[in-house]
């Protein structure tokens, strides 16, 4: 049984992009789906769709590569973990990697990117960073 579906999903995406695979399959959870929605909106992945196989849900993720065949994701890192939670207040959420990166935050208003959380004036648990 996998305890941390977010870490598992990020690791599967990272491994698939290193192997230059077109798609990868993740276990479904609402937080993972919200994280993928942000990654798709920020153009880190092409797309994703939820599929149901039997009584289990999975998410198929289509990865994105540049014209040279390199992954557009340089680094995908889990920040807050089950054993060590990391929280940032609304004043601590700032630009990441000079605006080229994204911080994904779980807030009281849902899972948001650092830009959205800053505009909404909320802080929360830092799930991961992407650039």
Curated annotation (Swiss-Prot):
GO terms for cellular component: ribonucleoprotein complex; ribosome. One of its GO terms (biological process) is translation. Keywords: Ribonucleoprotein, Ribosomal protein, RNA-binding, rRNA-binding. One of its GO terms (molecular function) is rRNA binding. Transmembrane segments: none annotated. It comes from the Bacteria. The keyword NAD does not apply. It holds the Pfam family Ribosomal_S8. InterPro entries: Ribosomal_uS8 (IPR000630), Ribosomal_uS8_CS (IPR047863), Ribosomal_uS8_sf (IPR035987). The keyword RNA-binding applies. Part of the 30S ribosomal subunit. Contacts proteins S5 and S12. HAMAP family: Ribosomal_uS8_B. One of the primary rRNA binding proteins, it binds directly to 16S rRNA central domain where it helps coordinate assembly of the platform of the 30S subunit. Belongs to the universal ribosomal protein uS8 family. This is Small ribosomal subunit protein uS8. It comes from Campylobacter fetus subsp. fetus (strain 82-40). The lineage of its organism: Bacteria, Pseudomonadati, Campylobacterota, Epsilonproteobacteria, Campylobacterales.
């Amino acid at each position: 049984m996998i305890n941390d579906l977010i870490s598992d999903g990020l690791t599967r995406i990272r491994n698939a992009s290193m192997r230059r695979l077109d798609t990868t399959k993740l276990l479904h959870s609402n937080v993972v789906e919200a994280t993928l929605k942000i990654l798709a909106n920020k153009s880190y992945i092409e797309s994703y769709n939820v599929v149901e196989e039997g009584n289990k849900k999975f998410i198929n993720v289509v990865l994105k590569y540049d014209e040279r065949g390199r992954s557009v994701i340089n680094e995908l890192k889990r920040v807050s973990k089950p054993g060590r939670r990391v929280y940032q207040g609304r004043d601590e959420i700032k630009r990441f990697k000079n605006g080229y990166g994204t911080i994904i935050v779980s807030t009281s208003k849902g899972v948001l990117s650092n830009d959205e959380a800053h505009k909404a004036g909320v802080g929360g648990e830092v799930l991961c960073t992407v650039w």
